[in-house]
Amino acid sequence: MITYEFPLNERIRKFLRIEEIFKKMETQMSNKKEFSAHICFATYFDIMSFASRGDLKVELIQEIEKQRLKLKSKIKTKNNIKIQTDLNKIRSQLEKSKVIAGFNFGGDKFLHELKTRANSPFGIVSTDFPEFQFWLESTSFTERKAYFKNKLNDISSIKIAISTLMHLLRNNVVSHSMETKTEEIQYKLDPSLKNDLVIITLPSKPKCFPNISSNKYAVNVHLKIKSGKSQTKAIKFKLGIASF
């Protein structure tokens, strides 16, 4: 099955973007192929561009507390108690995290130079920066992975918070089986509810991909046929509406 996720507000869009960038970083850190370190540095700078914003930390703490209070008001179960404990721990980690506003590399001239070159038209190129080439040649894969892991330590609480919140959101979903012979179908929403995420699941070898447009009253699903031909057979898929 292939799953597509569509945020219904800018806050969830931001959370999804941050989640994906962290996943990209983890994948490249475990990649032994040539130029993976180049991508790791570029991705690390992307992470720092949002992690160094003080408002993100505040927003995450507020959302964590909101979810904790919601769970506290529900019937006590082992699972709910565990989640509340995890949320308390994550909030504490966020509050203690040393996130400094702006790009601050603690006087690390090597990182400052890499950041400058990452913003140049050619990006990070070892030919233009002998010190970077020396670093690549003098470190092993294990050492480079440990280097990046250490750099992410101070902002790991952001990754954990985002991952936990998105897990809670995806688990609080109402799914519907949908079928259409046209390339468009509408699902009506309850305007009194606050919906955060649309999750569309298609077969593993689909002949189309979805896009959506939405408002507080409905989600319009647009199915784009890859071949460009008109659809003759019914398309079946799952439509999930998730909310905090």
Please place each PLM-identified region on the residue numbering:
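Amphipathic alpha-helix face/heptad-repeat signature
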Residues: 7-17, 40-43, 60, 79, ...
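N-terminal ordered "arm"
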Residues: 2-62
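An exposed acidic His-Trp-rich patch
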Residues: 79, 181-187, 241-243
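Extended, charged low-complexity segments
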Residues: 192-244
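Hydrophobic/aromatic-rich structural module bridging two neighboring secondary-structure elements via a short loop
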Residues: 52-110
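Alpha-helical rod/repeat scaffolding segments in eukaryotic adaptors/tethers
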Residues: 4, 33, 77-80, 104-107, ...
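Charged, well-structured binding/catalytic surfaces in domain cores that contact anionic ligands
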Residues: 93-195
